């Protein structure tokens, strides 16, 4: 017997109508936040970052591909990793198919990681993604944006009780805990105007949930995300699930 509250169609409709009002308010609030993002000041990128790409070394300006806007997903795949972070991989599952649509809107989308380019491209082939991936390992790009951490910065975390989920994902990436958490995920946005690159937006942590499409879908199911802080994280690379 279900423990959930049971009601009539009339009760459901009345509560659904009230919920719809709140959902619309949230949508309008999201529109307002998007406007405020666009109104943030642009910051000139003064450092000469260099990236390894499939077409050879490029500057940050060279990554725009003839467009005026650039979105970079900072994918957790550091030099000691054997494979990409499973959560970042699930995000790339969502992002990769959007690259073509974004090009039609004057926007280039790509992935950037610190691992060697050949390792990134081999993993991309395994995952079946059709999106550009560049190596930023020879520059301070990730570090300057706050997506790379030193041992000293990590020391308080490493000296504490490591969450089992972190140990789990470190193993899945073929590295140790320090190697795993030395990388961080994020999204950064850029504009190219009159030959100058400007940083316009950066986000990380739950600011990336918009790209976790499965959470948006699960939030609309009866069980929701159905996660607990103590259980192992369920997210896997898409070729690692055991489907019934």
Where are these regions (language model features)?
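Non-globular targeting/processing and membrane-anchoring segments
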Residues: 1-105, 122-128, 132, 139-244
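Short internal beta-strands
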Residues: 109-114
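Duplex nucleic acid-engaging cores and interfaces of nucleic-acid transaction enzymes
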Residues: 117
């Amino acid at each position: 017997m279900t423990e959930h509250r049971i009601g009539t169609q009339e009760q459901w409709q009345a509560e659904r109508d009230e919920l719809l009002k709140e959902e619309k308010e949230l949508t309008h609030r999201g529109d307002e936040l998007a406007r405020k993002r666009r109104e943030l000041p642009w910051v000139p990128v003064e450092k000469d970052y260099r990236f390894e790409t499939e077409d050879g070394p490029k500057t940050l300006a060279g990554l725009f591909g003839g467009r005026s806007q650039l979105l970079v997903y900072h994918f957790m795949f550091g030099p000691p990793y054997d494979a990409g972070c499973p959560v970042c991989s699930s995000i790339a599952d969502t992002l990769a198919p959007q690259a073509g649509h974004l090009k039609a809107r004057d926007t280039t989308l790509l992935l950037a990681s610190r691992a060697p380019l050949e390792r990134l491209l081999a993993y991309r082939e395994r995952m079946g993604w059709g999106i550009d991936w560049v190596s930023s390992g020879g520059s301070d790009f990730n570090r300057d944006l706050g997506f790379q951490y030193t041992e000293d910065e990590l020391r308080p975390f490493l000296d504490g009780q490591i969450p089992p989920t972190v140990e789990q994902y470190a193993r899945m990436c073929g590295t140790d805990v320090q190697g795993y958490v030395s990388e961080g995920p994020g999204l950064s946005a850029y504009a190219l105007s009159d030959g100058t690159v400007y940083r316009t937006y950066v986000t990380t942590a739950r600011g990336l949930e918009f790209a976790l499409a499965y959470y948006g879908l699960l939030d609309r199911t009866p069980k929701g995300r159905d996660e607990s802080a103590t259980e192992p994280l369920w997210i896997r690379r898409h070729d690692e699930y055991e489907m019934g």
